Amino acid sequence: MIDLHTHSVLSDGELLPAELARRAYVAGYKALAITDHVDSGNLALVLAQLIKVSKDLNKYMKIKILPGVEITHVPPQQIPELAGLARKLGAKIIVVHGESPVEPVISGTNSAGLESDIDILAHPGLITEKEIKLAKKRGIYLELSARRGHSLTNGYVAKLARKFG
């Protein structure tokens, strides 16, 4: 089992990265990406901390830790720049916080994310058929979330993903 979208105390999570990794390992996970929320103000700082702790934990633990980011609530036009910077700085997993139906995410975020160098579009809400096809073409994964609210469109996203991909 793996989880490629988790948060630590570096954003809105409750655990230090080491405790998050330990708990995941005990629960049977083989790999864990820590993808804390970032924007232009904290991307470099958060990612540097996650890269350091991931390197340290990978020396001593039997679970693979991947440093990453979740680009969150930024203007869609800024997503390509931030994704490129995150990749350049060493992010192994780049997530974009999609247009969830329960948060005021800016319209156009899904499309901008799918046009950028990202790995996962998280909780994409009422994603369009065109966007689903673009995700398939670019090899970008779409997240189905267990989180309350974000999960409201899981059935819709899964149905379209099956239809087109």
Model-predicted regions and their roles:
Residues M1-S11, I34-H37, P124:
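Histidine-centered catalytic micro-motifs
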Residues D12-G28:
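Conserved N-terminal beta1-alpha1 strand-loop-helix module at the mouth
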Residues A31-I34, L66:
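Short, well-structured secondary-structure segments
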Residues A33-V46:
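Glycine-rich, proline-tolerant flexible connector loops at the mouths of alpha/beta enzymes
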Residues H37, F164-G165:
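Short acidic/histidine-rich active-site segments
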Residues L43-G149, G155:
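Extended substrate/RNA-proximal surfaces in nucleic-acid metabolism proteins
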Residues A135-K136, A161-F164:
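Short, conserved loop/helix-junction motifs that constitute active-site signature segments
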